[in-house]
């Protein structure tokens, strides 16, 4: 399992199955009640000196604010099956007449994830002026190796008056990732227009329709706005038979959450043998116990604010900057061992500077219902929107021991 593995990347079984994973729990998660940085300009486009795609920011806003209608007809049903949205900004592109060649670094795509949708988004005026275009897709890692992934032809209708053209590359990417096959096909991809507000139009591109100048030009990311050419991948992490460690903890410290089956068996054997010895030392008393008035402690939900900047995660988490994760509190003699039932919430809690009394939890006073949370962050030069399970305590209660 990756962090946010987003990132979101944006999976849980609950009565809200009909709702997209990235939208589940939104009834209780609101910018006012959960997100602590409500004063932050959520429309900011700068992060660590880099501009992040306007599309990713809009998608994040739509998710946390429940704007289903703002999603396209293709993206809305896809989000119901996805928990991660990953964006890849083009490293460079070349044009020769009406032939466009795009280069992306897709090294961070996990083959263990199930690809749901791949969209190529091109927001260049020169591309809109072309009528018949051939597009070649390449994977490149640090510009050293260029691997051809597939190609397609499309006719752009002049009636499609929009800022961006969006192409469905799901089949192309699935064929390459699962079978290693290159896909070359004519007209299998339909162009559709998608209007993006606040699209930067500062960059100027030469008209590639001037065939007389067949000289090849190469443009790099620095020459145009970040979202001008971008590949957006919607995916879902594959389910496993064994329960996975917290996605946040596994992302940062994978070795810490490694599981040694042999060690578990040995520890289990020692624990069983110790319990047997303890049982043999128990003596039955003939004196009846005195009646004790039973006082049930209160198990309640209290605030637990998480500031990602303070725990050292501010350099890669874009939104939210902070949030209220809550925790369960009750008087208890025996604290809970948080390693027994590790969750994203317990991992976050272990990083906070809580007092000993705040850190202790009763084994019987535990979260009864937890919510997931979508996060937008920067990883491996890619911007990722990922949905993480068990991030916020919604209800506390006593469990049977």
UniProtKB/Swiss-Prot annotation:
A GO cellular-component term linked to this record: extracellular space
Keyword line: Cleavage on pair of basic residues, Developmental protein, Disulfide bond, Gastrulation, Glycoprotein, Growth factor, Secreted, Signal
Subcellular compartments: Secreted
Record annotation: effect of changing residue 299 to S: Retains neural-inducing activity but at reduced potency
Alphabetical list of SMART domains matching this protein: TGFB
Any one GO molecular-function label of the UniProt entry: growth factor activity
InterPro entries reported in the protein's UniProt record: Cystine-knot_cytokine, TGF-b_C, TGF-b_propeptide, TGF-beta-rel
Glycosylation sites: 168, 337, 341, 344
Principal subcellular localization: secreted
Record's note on what induces expression: By Li(+), siamois and wnt signaling, including wnt8 and lef1. Induction by wnt8 is inhibited by vegt. Not induced by vegt or activin.
Family to which the UniProt record says this protein belongs: Belongs to the TGF-beta family.
Described purpose of this protein according to its UniProt entry: Exhibits mesoderm-dorsalizing activity and neural-inducing activity, but lacks mesoderm-inducing activity. Regulates the expression of specific mesodermal and neural genes. Induces convergent extension movements at the embryonic midline by activating the fgf signaling pathway to induce t/bra expression in the organizer region. Acts with wnt11 to induce Spemann organizer cells and induce axis formation. The unprocessed protein antagonizes bmp-signaling.
Assembly: Monomer. The propeptide region interacts with bmp4 in a non-covalent manner.
Designated name of the protein: Nodal homolog 3-A
Organism: Xenopus laevis (African clawed frog)
Gene: nodal3-a
